[in-house]
């Protein structure tokens, strides 16, 4: 028992003396020090070897993809007109979700296509703690 305590305290003393009391090293960062930005951080180009027929070498500066567009892959017919690749499509004006709720709103019969008023002052019930 005594040997265990002596060994324990000797180990603590040895590690305590071996550990440096100050941070050792070059350019130690302290709390509150302003850090430099990573200068000229660039993502390496890992794309194709040919751009517009020109051979691309490592380190070449590449142009941005001007007017990059996602190709249209939707239906072939829009409003009865044949849609060709490259045609500019209009936005869906007045797109509305169909009403699929109850048949009665405030005692009135609701028909398909009727415009429904927004629910004023709709509130979620409070389900939190009492205090």
UniProtKB/Swiss-Prot annotation:
Pathway: Mycotoxin biosynthesis. GigA is processed by several endopeptidases including kexin proteases to produce 2 identical copies of the nonaxapeptide Ile-Asn-Phe-Lys-Ile-Pro-Tyr-Thr-Gly, one copy of the nonaketide Ile-Gly-Phe-Lys-Leu-Pro-Tyr-Arg-Gly and one copy of the nonaketide Pro-Asn-Phe-Lys-Met-Pro-Tyr-Arg-Gly, that are further modified into phomapsins B, C and A, respectively. After being excised from the precursor peptide, the core peptides are cyclized and modified post-translationally by enzymes encoded within the gene cluster. Residues 1-18 form the signal peptide. The keyword Disulfide bond does not apply. Residues 19-38, 48-65, 75-92, 102-119, 129-131 form a propeptide. Keywords: Repeat, Signal. Ribosomally synthesized cyclic peptide phomopsin precursor; part of the gene cluster that mediates the biosynthesis of the epichloecyclins, a group of nonapeptides, with a likely cyclic structure and dimethylation of the conserved lysine. The gigA translated product contains 4 repeated peptide embedding the nonapeptide Ile-Asn-Phe-Lys-Ile-Pro-Tyr-Thr-Gly in repeats 1 and 2, Ile-Gly-Phe-Lys-Leu-Pro-Tyr-Arg-Gly in repeat 3, and Pro-Asn-Phe-Lys-Met-Pro-Tyr-Arg-Gly in repeat 4 that are converted into epichloecyclins B, C and A, respectively. This is Ribosomally synthesized cyclic peptide phomopsin precursor gigA. It comes from Epichloe festucae (strain Fl1).
């Amino acid at each position: 028992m005594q040997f265990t305590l002596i060994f324990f305290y000797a180990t603590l003393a040895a590690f305590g003396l071996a550990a440096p009391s100050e941070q050792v090293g070059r350019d130690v960062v302290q709390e509150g020090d302003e850090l430099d930005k990573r200068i000229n951080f660039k993502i390496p180009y890992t794309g194709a070897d040919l751009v517009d027929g020109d051979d691309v070498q490592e380190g070449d500066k590449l142009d941005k993809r001007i007017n990059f567009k996602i190709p249209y892959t939707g239906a072939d017919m829009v409003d009865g007109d044949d849609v060709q690749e490259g045609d500019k499509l209009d936005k869906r004006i007045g797109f509305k979700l169909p009403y699929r709720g109850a048949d009665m709103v405030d005692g009135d019969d609701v028909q398909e296509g009727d415009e429904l008023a927004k629910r004023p002052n709709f509130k979620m019930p409070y389900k939190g703690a009492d205090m």
